[in-house]
C-alpha cells in the first residue's frame, strides 16, 4: 500500500476471510470477485441468515464517495429492470483506519456467461439457445435504455446466467460507468 498525492490510502485488496464481520450485521462467506473499483464478497445477514453481495470500494477509486453514490443511484433508478441485481443499502466500515464504503445488494445464484459458454459442446450454443439468450439480453437492455441509461461495459464476464431452461434469466454485473 502506498499513499497517492491526495493522501487517500491506496488499497489493492481487502483480503477478507470467511467468518469476518462487516458492520456487525454481516458475516463474510467468501470473495466473489474483484475489479478496478473494488472487491465483491458473498455475505450473510447475521439476524436473518439471508445471503447478499457486498461491493467494497477501494478508497482511491471512490473519492468523496462519488463512485459509490453514482453506482447506488443508478441501481436505484433501474430497480424495476428485471436484468438488474437489486441494491439494498450503503454501509461504512473502517479498514486499516480508513473509511470504506460498501454497497449491499441481492446475491444472485448462477454462473458467468463466459463460464456457461465454456461448458457447452464446442463452447457454443445451438441456434435455438442463442436466440433465446439474445432475446433475454435484448429485453433486459431495452428496459435499461428506456430509462435513458446504459451498461457501459457489457461482455460475457458481466452477465450472470441464473436460470436456464426454455428461456434465460440473466443479471448484469458492473453497471458503472
Task: Label each residue range with its predicted role.
Residues 1-21:
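Juxta-kinase regulatory segment immediately upstream of eukaryotic protein kinase catalytic domains
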Residues 133-134:
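Activation segment signature within eukaryotic-like protein kinase domains
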Residues 113-124:
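AlphaC helix of the protein kinase catalytic domain
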Residues 29-35, 40:
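Protein kinase glycine-rich loop
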Residues 97-112:
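Conserved short submotifs of the Hanks-type protein kinase catalytic core
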Residues 46-67:
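ATP-binding glycine-rich loop module of kinase domains
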Residues 145-162:
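Catalytic-loop of the protein kinase fold
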Residues 86-101:
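Short beta-strand micro-motifs within the conserved protein kinase catalytic domain, predominantly
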